[in-house]
C-alpha cells in the first residue's frame, strides 16, 4: 500500500471501487426507502408540506448558482449516467472516465491506472458548484485542503481490500433485522429533496465492497436531490477485522457507534441537514472519517510489518556472517594438491600449533577433519570446527576390522525380529507376477534372437574388406546356416551332438540389450523374464535329454564334492550343457537318498488319514496341500499310500471264490495288463491286488507243480547271466514261473551259502544310499546301482569308509545245486496267507519287503 502523498496513478484503482461501493450502498438504501415508503404512507403524507417548502428552497438555490456563477446546468436524460445539476463539462469528464475504465476491464488491463486527471476548467466548475451547494444548505467546508487540490475529484489514499465493512451493514438488505428494529426504539428522519423522484446515483457495478471516498460532493448532491420522505432505522452492526497477531486488533464498531451517537445528539439542532443522512444512519462526512481512521490504522500495521521484515533480514545476514563458507576438498582444482577429508583452509594452516587464526585455521587432534562435499559448513568464522571428534569405541551399527590385509565388517547380533524377517524374506520368491509361457511366445523369442544375431553377422560381413566373390560365398554360407537352423530348432537333446550345437551360432550368447529389443518388438514380457527364460529353457544349446548313467555318476560325485552347493560350478564341470537348475533337480529327485523317505511309519499313516478327512471336498483331494502336513513326502507318495493301502474301502485278506471269478472275467474282457479297468469289476480290491492275485495264483499259464532239477539248473544259469535281484527278467526267461516263485526258489537253494548273506547286505545298503521311491515318476529313475554308489563313496572317502564287498553278478560255485524235491513252494494262496497285501503290492513292486529288488 502506498503512502498518502505517493504517486496518484498508483492509488487510483481502489478509489473507483470506493465510488462503485458507495453507489451500491446508495442503491440499496433507495430500494429500502421504496419499501419503507409503502409501509409508512401516513408519515409521508404528514410531511408533504415540509417537502414542498424544501423543494422551493432548493430550486431557488439552483437558480442562484446559475446566475451568480455563470454555470450552465444540464439535466441528464438518464440519471443513472449523471446526477442532475452537475455542470456539463463535469458530466462529460465523468462519462469519459467511466468509458476509459470499461475499456480497461474489457481488455483485461485492470492493473493499469484508469483515472484521467481533470482539466482546470472542470476543477474550477466543480469547486464553484460545491461551494454554492454548501452555502445553500448552510454547510461549512471542513476540509479546505481538498478544495485547493487540483485532484480533489480523485480518490484519497489506498487501503487494504480486506479491511471492508460488513456486507450486511453496507448492503442494508437484511429485511428481518430492519423490521425488528422498526418495531423497537427507532429514530425517524425526514430527508427532504427537491430535484429527483425515485432516482439515485448509479455507477457501473464493481466487485469491490470497500467504503467510499471519491468525489465527496457528488454524494452530497445526490442526497440533496432525492425526492420523497423515507423512514430509516438505525441499527448497530459490529464489524471486527481480524489481523495477524501484532497487537493491532481493530474494532470498527466503536467508530460507527461514536459517529451514530453524534448524529442522534445533533438531530434536533440540525434538522435541516437531514438530507445528508443515509439510510444506515451515517452521512458521507462520517464515512470519510471512518475511512481515514482505517487508513491510519493500516499504515501503522504495514509499518510494523516492514519493521519485522527488516529485522528478519538483519538476523539472516548476521547468521550468514557467522558461518564461514569454505570450498570442500573435492572442488579444489588449483594448487596441485587434493586430500580427502580436509578443506583448503585447513591444508594452508595445518602447521599452526593452536589451531586458530587466519582465514581457515589449523585443527587440533581433538577436532574432526572436515569431509564435506561441495561447500563446508563445519567451521566457524574463526576457522574453528563446530564439532568435536567422538571418543573411540565400537559403532552401534557396524565396524570394520582388517585381518591379514582383508577388511572384515562386523554387525551386531540379530534380535528375534530380524531373524524372523530374514527367514520370511528368504522364503519369498524373487518375482511375483508370473504366468506360464506359451508355445507361441517361445517361438517369437527364438525367432527374434535369431534375427538379431543374423543382423550382427551381416553387419560384420559388410564391414569386412572382401572381394565380390568372397562376399557372395560367405553370404550364401550364412543363409544356408540360417535355413538349417529353421529346420532343426529343437533337436538338441544332449552334448554328444557337438556339430549340431556349433550350427546354432545364430542363438549364441544374446545380450540383455538384444533381448530387450526383441521384447519391445514382438513380446509382451519384460526383458528380465525373457532373459531368464532363454538362459534356463529356450536356448537351443541347453541339453534337455534324459540323464545318462555316466552323467548321474559324475553329478553325484560333484554334488558330494561341493556338499550340495555351488550348482553353477557343478553344471560347468559336468560339461554336458546342463543348466544349474536341471542339475539340482536331478540330484534332489533321483540321486539324493536323504531327500525322500522310503517306508511309511505308523505315525505318518495316522497323520495322513486325519488330514485327508479334514481337507476332503467330496471326492476331490488337494494332495499338494496334504504334503504340507507330512514333511519329506510328495503328493504322489501320499496319493498312492492312501489309495493303495490306507483307504478304508480296501478289502484285505483271503480272496473269495466270487472275487476270483469276477477277476478272471474282467481279465478275459480287458486283457492282461489293464489293471486300472479290471479293479472296477472287483469291488474293494486295488489294481495291485488284482495283478498279484491273477499273476501269482489265477493265471492258467502258471506251473504250480514242484520245481524239477532241470528248472533249478536253468534258474541258476539265468540268474548268473542276468544278475541277482532282477527277478522280473528272470521270470520272463523262465516263461512258466513268476518272479516271486523264482526269488523264493533261489533263496531256498542258497540259504546255507554266503551268496544269500551278501545279497541281503547289498539290499540293506541300497535302502540307505539309493532312492527307490519313484511312484508316479518312473521316468526319473536313475540307472545307477548300489555298486556304483559304493564306488563313488570309496573314491571320495577312501580312509573313513571301510572296504565294502562289492557284489556284482554273483555266481554259485556248485554246479549241481542241492534240490529238495520233498520241499515245494505252495503258492496257491500267497496273498491270502498275509493279511496285509500291501507288502506284495508296493509302489516299486517289491514282493519281498526286505530282499526283493525290482528293476
From Swiss-Prot:
It comes from the Eukaryota. CDD domains: SANT. SMART domains: SANT. Signal peptide: none annotated. The keyword Ion transport does not apply. Residues 596-646 form the Myb-like domain. This is Myb-like protein L. It comes from Dictyostelium discoideum. The lineage of its organism: Eukaryota, Amoebozoa, Evosea, Eumycetozoa, Dictyostelia. The gene is mybL.
Amino acid at each position: 500500500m502506498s503512502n498518502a502523498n505517493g504517486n496518484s496513478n498508483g492509488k487510483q484503482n481502489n478509489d473507483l471501487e470506493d465510488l462503485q461501493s458507495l453507489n451500491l450502498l446508495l442503491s440499496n438504501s433507495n430500494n429500502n426507502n421504496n419499501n419503507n415508503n409503502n409501509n409508512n404512507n401516513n408519515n409521508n403524507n404528514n410531511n408533504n408540506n415540509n417537502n414542498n417548502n424544501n423543494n422551493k428552497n432548493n430550486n431557488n438555490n439552483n437558480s442562484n448558482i446559475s446566475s451568480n456563477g455563470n454555470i450552465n446546468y444540464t439535466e441528464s436524460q438518464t440519471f443513472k449516467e449523471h446526477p442532475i445539476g452537475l455542470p456539463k463539462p463535469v458530466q462529460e469528464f465523468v462519462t469519459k472516465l467511466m468509458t476509459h475504465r470499461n475499456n480497461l476491464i474489457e481488455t483485461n488491463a485492470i492493473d493499469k491506472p484508469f483515472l484521467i486527471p481533470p482539466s482546470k476548467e472542470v476543477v474550477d466548475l466543480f469547486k464553484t458548484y460545491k461551494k454554492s451547494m454548501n452555502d445553500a444548505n448552510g454547510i461549512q467546508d471542513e476540509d479546505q485542503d481538498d478544495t485547493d487540490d487540483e485532484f480533489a475529484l480523485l480518490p484519497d489514499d489506498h487501503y487494504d481490500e480486506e479491511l471492508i465493512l460488513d456486507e450486511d451493514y453496507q448492503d442494508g438488505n437484511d429485511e428481518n433485522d430492519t423490521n425488528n428494529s422498526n418495531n423497537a426504539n427507532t429514530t425517524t428522519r425526514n430527508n427532504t429533496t427537491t430535484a429527483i423522484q425515485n432516482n439515485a446515483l448509479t455507477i457501473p457495478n464493481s466487485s469491490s465492497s470497500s467504503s467510499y471516498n471519491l468525489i465527496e460532493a457528488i454524494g452530497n448532491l445526490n442526497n440533496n436531490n432525492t425526492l420523497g420522505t423515507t423512514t430509516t432505522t438505525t441499527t448497530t452492526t459490529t464489524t471486527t477485522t481480524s489481523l495477524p497477531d501484532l497487537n493491532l486488533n481493530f474494532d470498527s464498531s466503536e467508530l460507527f457507534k461514536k459517529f451514530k451517537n453524534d448524529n442522534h445528539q445533533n438531530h434536533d439542532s440540525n434538522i435541516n441537514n437531514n438530507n445528508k443522512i443515509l439510510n444506515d444512519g451515517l452521512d458521507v462526512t462520517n464515512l470519510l472519517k471512518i475511512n481515514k481512521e482505517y487508513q491510519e490504522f493500516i499504515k501503522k500495521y504495514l509499518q510494523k510489518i516492514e519493521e519485522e521484515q527488516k529485522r528478519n533480514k538483519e538476523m539472516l545476514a548476521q547468521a550468514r556472517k557467522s558461518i564461514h563458507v569454505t570450498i570442500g576438498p573435492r572442488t579444489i582444482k588449483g594448487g596441485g594438491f587434493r586430500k580427502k577429508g580436509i578443506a583448503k583452509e585447513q591444508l594452508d594452516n595445518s602447521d599452526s600449533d593452536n589451531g586458530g587464526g587466519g582465514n581457515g585455521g589449523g585443527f587440533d587432534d581433538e577436532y574432526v577433519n572436515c569431509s564435506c562435499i561441495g561447500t563446508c559448513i563445519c567451521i566457524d568464522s574463526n576457522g574453528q570446527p563446530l564439532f568435536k571428534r567422538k571418543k573411540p569405541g565400537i559403532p552401534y551399527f557396524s565396524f570394520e576390522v582388517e585381518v591379514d590385509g582383508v577388511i572384515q565388517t562386523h554387525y551386531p547380533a540379530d534380535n528375534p525380529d530380524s531373524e524372523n524377517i530374514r527367514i520370511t524374506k528368504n522364503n519369498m520368491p524373487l518375482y511375483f507376477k508370473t504366468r506360464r509361457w506359451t508355445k507361441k511366445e517361445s517361438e517369437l523369442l527364438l525367432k527374434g534372437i535369431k534375427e538379431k544375431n543374423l543382423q550382427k553377422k551381416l553387419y560384420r560381413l559388410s564391414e569386412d574388406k572382401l572381394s565380390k566373390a568372397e562376399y557372395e560365398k560367405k553370404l550364401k554360407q550364412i543363409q544356408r546356416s540360417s535355413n538349417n537352423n529353421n529346420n532343426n530348432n529343437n533337436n538338441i537333446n544332449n552334448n554328444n551332438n557337438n556339430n549340431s550345437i556349433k550350427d546354432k551360432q545364430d542363438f549364441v550368447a544374446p545380450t540383455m540389450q538384444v533381448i530387450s529389443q526383441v521384447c519391445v518388438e514382438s513380446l509382451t514380457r519384460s526383458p528380465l523374464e525373457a532373459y531368464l527364460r532363454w538362459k534356463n529353457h529356450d536356448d537351443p544349446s541347453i541339453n534337455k535329454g534324459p540323464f545318462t548313467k555316466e552323467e548321474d555318476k559324475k553329478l553325484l560325485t560333484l554334488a558330494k564334492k561341493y556338499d550340495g552347493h555351488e550348482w553353477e560350478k557343478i553344471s560347468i564341470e559336468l560339461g554336458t550343457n546342463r543348466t544349474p537348475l536341471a542339475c539340482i533337480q536331478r540330484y534332489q529327485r533321483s540321486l539324493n537318498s536323504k531327500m525322500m523317505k522310503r517306508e511309511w511309519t505308523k505315525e505318518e499313516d495316522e497323520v495322513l488319514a486325519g488330514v485327508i478327512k479334514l481337507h476332503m471336498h467330496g471326492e476331490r483331494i488337494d494332495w499338494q496341500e496334504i504334503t504340507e502336513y507330512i514333511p519329506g513326502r510328495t503328493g504322489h507318495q501320499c496319493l498312492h499310500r492312501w489309495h493303495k493301502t490306507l483307504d478304508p474301502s480296501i478289502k484285505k485278506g483271503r480272496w473269495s471264490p466270487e472275487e476270483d471269478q469276477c477277476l478272471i472275467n474282467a481279465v478275459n474282457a480287458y486283457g492282461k495288463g489293464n489293471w486300472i479297468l479290471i479293479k472296477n469289476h472287483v469291488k474293494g480290491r486295488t489294481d495291485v491286488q488284482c495283478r498279484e492275485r491273477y499273476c501269482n495264483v489265477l493265471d492258467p499259464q502258471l506251473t504250480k507243480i514242484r520245481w524239477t532239477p532241470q528248472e533249478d539248473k536253468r534258474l541258476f544259469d539265468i540268474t548268473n547271466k542276468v544278475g541277482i535281484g532282477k527277478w522280473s527278467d528272470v521270470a520272463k526267461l523262465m516263461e512258466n514261473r513268476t518272479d516271486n516263485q523264482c526269488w523264493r526258489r533261489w533263496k531256498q537253494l542258497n540259504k546255507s551259502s554266503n551268496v544269500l548273506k551278501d545279497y541281503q547286505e547289498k539290499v540293506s545298503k541300497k535302502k540307505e544310499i539309493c532312492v527307490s521311491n519313484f511312484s508316479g515318476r518312473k521316468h526319473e529313475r536313475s540307472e545307477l546301482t548300489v555298486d556304483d554308489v559304493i564306488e563313488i563313496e570309496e573314491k571320495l572317502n577312501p580312509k573313513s569308509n571301510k572296504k565294502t564287498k562289492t557284489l556284482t553278478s554273483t555266481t554259485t560255485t556248485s554246479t549241481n545245486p542241492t534240490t529238495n524235491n520233498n520241499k515245494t513252494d505252495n503258492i496257491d494262496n500267497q496273498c491270502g496267507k498275509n493279511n496285509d497285501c500291501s507288502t506284495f503290492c508296493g509302489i516299486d513292486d517289491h514282493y519281498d519287503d526286505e530282499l526283493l529288488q525290482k528293476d
